Amino acid sequence: MAEADREQWGYVPFEHVGPLRFGMSEAEAVVAMEAAGFTCEKETRQGHITGKVTCRRPTARGMEPDVTAYFVDHLDAKGLTCLTVDGRGGPQVTWEGVKLIGRVPSQLTAEFLACVEERDLGFGISAQGDVFPVDQGFIPATQRAGDAVVTRAMFANPEGWAFTVGDCIPEEAWDVR
């Protein structure tokens, strides 16, 4: 998808990604996403992640939803805990001036390394080998887009029920290729 065609979303770590706020209910998330022009489907789940909402723009053609939101009702946490943004057709999410979605992975890595050095942040390496700034509430990943590979991102807030951002991300979110 061309950059000019993507929705533009802001990101504040552990608070919100675009119109979605961590802790909001499934119903609130559906209202927010439908107001932004997306069509949503809800799914009830078993375990710590009790709900899933997938959202697509009406013009979406890919197999993966543009945005997938996961909800928790466990220990001291309730509501939106994790969301993923598709690299092929999802909204562009910007963190600290860095565009996270639909990028060439090596270019995003170079920007991350410059950013963590400039801001004196630490960095980690995901299970897939992607570099990311730690303690910022997101982990980048990659997925195929035809013959190319582009970046996508998984955002989470572990407050009240998990130890790390990675602990909040369901296995199926890691498996998107």
Regions found by a protein language model. Give the residues of each.
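Short helix/turn-capping signatures at newly exposed starts of structured segments
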Residues: 1-177
